[in-house]
Amino acid sequence: MMDKIIVKGGQTKLQGEVEIEGAKNAVLPLLAATLLASEGEVVLTNVPILSDVFMMNNLVNHLGTAISFDQEAKKIIAKSNSEIKTTAPYEYVSKMRASIVVMGPILARNGQARVSMPGGCSIGSRPIDLHLRGFEQMGATITQNAGYIEAKADKLKGAHIYLDFPSVGATQNLILAATLADGTTTLENAAREPEIVDLANLLNKMGANVKGAGTDTIIIKGVEKMHGANHSVVQDRIEAGTFMVAAAMTQGDVLIKDAIAEHNRPLISKLSEMGVNFIQEESGLRVVGPEKLKATSVKTLPHPGFPTDMQSQMTAAQAVAVGESVMVETVFENRFQHLKEMRRIGLEVDITRNTALIQGNSNLQGAAVKSTDLRASAALILLGLVAKGQTTVRRLSHLDRGYYKFHEKLKALGADIIRVEDEDGEG
């Protein structure tokens, strides 16, 4: 049975301090990277306890790298294997798009890889197209067969690859593949996210030679083999950002422990425009929300622009800001589904293709809503904090993919929030 979250809002001013987990978007490719080691152990610390991490652990374990996860210590030990399997089967890959990043490591080590189509997306769709074209440029032959993508190359060769779009997944997959290739690979128009830097840091500790991560040109010199290493997962900037918005919306005063302001520049800049105060302290970043937020215009872009993963949460802040706000989503299609649910709480919004015009409304009323995706579920809970009366958020399986104990952290900051079994809901 699924759970639901019940928030009683309208009065809450969040106060206190909050600890942020390791980044989900970093740890999944780090787990894929463990497949590249043919000797030793890769030890990952600061690992977030999330359903996506369990799924990736199962996949990597199935492929031949033995995984043990000590949840109390937030530590994963990945024991390398002199041989790994070539096929990533449907039951592991279908549940999680990010699992496509095992293709690069398998191909690099085995000269061939068979990976089930992730979440049933067709090859022509943009996200995976870039990965495959990159593999082809490195000398692989790609075929599609019975729901599987197959790549074959006796030995991958270094190549000069230009990405049409700075896709995070493609950048990660191609870096992973290039680590063991013959010669040097140059990736141009590469994604620049902090999670890419984190991946390169681990790979270099494992014996790879990756330079330029965090810029749009990444150069990878292939090495003979890779080994174990120790690495602490970078902090989750999206979780940190979500708590920044929560403090901003509730006239709160919240210290985000060890926050890396550098990773959240665009968000901090936009929230500052809305009247939020940020104070850098020794132990983290203090976020102080104003009496009333001011409206603002936001456009999502690849890093270092405003992150699409903060778009839903930001629309929740815009919903209670004074005046008309604009949100333009340029990174993903179809990422406004949560706005229809927010309307039930009283959001006033006009949507034209990828642009939402939001009229701020300080008179929101709690309602029953269901989350449409991971970030939307957090955004609906944030809106519930400021809406008068009771908001019930269902379908929490989305939330658990990317937030650990989200309701408990909010409760510790003073929110009136509980999570209970959903007797009559659909999960």
Curated annotation (Swiss-Prot):
The modification 2-(S-cysteinyl)pyruvic acid O-phosphothioketal is found at C121. Cell wall formation. Adds enolpyruvyl to UDP-N-acetylglucosamine. UDP-N-acetyl-alpha-D-glucosamine binds at R97, R126, P127, I128, D129, L130, D309, V331. The active site is at C121 (proton donor). Keywords: Cell cycle, Cell division, Cell shape, Cell wall biogenesis/degradation, Cytoplasm, Peptidoglycan synthesis, Pyruvate, Transferase. It catalyses: phosphoenolpyruvate + UDP-N-acetyl-alpha-D-glucosamine = UDP-N-acetyl-3-O-(1-carboxyvinyl)-alpha-D-glucosamine + phosphate. Belongs to the EPSP synthase family. MurA subfamily. The lineage of its organism: Bacteria, Bacillati, Bacillota, Bacilli, Lactobacillales. The keyword Metal-binding does not apply. It holds the Pfam family EPSP_synthase. This is UDP-N-acetylglucosamine 1-carboxyvinyltransferase 1. It comes from Lactococcus lactis subsp. lactis (strain IL1403). One of its GO terms (cellular component) is cytoplasm. One of its GO terms (molecular function) is UDP-N-acetylglucosamine 1-carboxyvinyltransferase activity.
